[in-house]
Amino acid sequence: MPGATFSVSDANFDKEVLKSTEPVLVDFFAEWCGPCKAMAPALEQVAAEMKGKVKVAKLDVDQNPEVTQKYTIQAMPTLMIFKGGKKVAERVGALTQKKQLQDWITGSI
């Protein structure tokens, strides 16, 4: 299911996340982050299965300092859910099980 998530950056964060008509889960990650890599397969599955209910975006913190600083990201992975242009949920740490991710998302949107 690769390709169910999409990348966002400092340049398109407002358009793709804050102005989205559906909720967006943003995975703030780093290429060197082991827990981020461990969570990636579950995130892809959830993105595919929840398509139409929530979009799943990935933001590389090392490549996008503006958004990273704006939301005070200090540990990876950090997951945030945005709805209607506002952050409605945040979780620091990996959720490697698909059901854990789905339950957290469903409870937040």
Question: Where do the model's predicted regions map?
Answer:
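Typically the conserved alpha-helix immediately C-terminal to a functionally engaged Cys/Sec
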Residues: 35-51
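Short pre-active-site segment immediately N-terminal to redox-active cysteine/selenocysteine motifs
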Residues: 21-22, 29-32, 75
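Conserved Rossmann-like nucleotide-binding pocket used by diverse enzymes
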Residues: 9, 29, 55-57
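Non-catalytic, surface beta->alpha helical segment in thiol-disulfide oxidoreductase systems
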Residues: 75, 80-109
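N-terminal targeting signals for export/organelle localization
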Residues: 1-5, 109
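Structural microenvironment flanking redox-active thiols in thiol-disulfide oxidoreductases
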Residues: 61-68
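Hydrophobic beta-strand anchors of alpha/beta hydrolase catalytic cores
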Residues: 25-26, 56, 79
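A short beta-strand-turn-helix
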Residues: 5-24, 65
